[in-house]
């Protein structure tokens, strides 16, 4: 089961609504779902909440170290409570996935994400779970830093929030350790409903002047 849920982002009001803070948004949504409140914990260099689920302690963490030092916070809490990497899930922004989608995976490279890079280094492994929240790509590599540190357009923000709410449907499976079910829930989105069409003979004649 997942015992430590981490959301990546940067602290401070100037970063709160930026794409790079999508992981923070996810943890905020999970905290609301579990009815817990994140509070500062200096020992773990972040905002922390503890929930009790089926007799097990579950931890929520938002590192307050700034993105590039996220591993310091994650490793401090994981080591103190003896949580192995395979029981950690890190929610983060993902350039290679469009807004409105999220993907669940275990292990793999950090793909240039500095928060993941530091977690790799501090845990000494990449063998932890990631929830990759799509923020889209600016199309030009040179614009990536500017892109992640800017606010998404309102329609993109709505899509990102929709994907966060959709992926939260998987949290009971994550807590139960049913990662196949969790993956299916995260990756499956409802296709748009086809528009109902009337039989030709049943259609009313257009009124004069309706054009």
Curated annotation (Swiss-Prot):
Keywords: Cytoplasm, Hydrolase, RNA-binding, tRNA-binding. It is found in: Cytoplasm. One of its GO terms (biological process) is rescue of stalled ribosome. It comes from the Bacteria. TRNA binds at residues 15, 66, 68, 114. The record marks 93 as: Stabilizes the basic form of H active site to accept a proton. Pfam families: Pept_tRNA_hydro. Residues 197-211 have a biased composition (Low complexity). InterPro entries: Pept_tRNA_hydro, Pept_tRNA_hydro_CS, Pept_tRNA_hydro_sf. Its EC number is 3.1.1.29. Monomer. Hydrolyzes ribosome-free peptidyl-tRNAs (with 1 or more amino acids incorporated), which drop off the ribosome during protein synthesis, or as a result of ribosome stalling. Catalyzes the release of premature peptidyl moieties from peptidyl-tRNA molecules trapped in stalled 50S ribosomal subunits, and thus maintains levels of free tRNAs and 50S ribosomes. This is Peptidyl-tRNA hydrolase. It comes from Acidovorax ebreus (strain TPSY). The gene is pth.
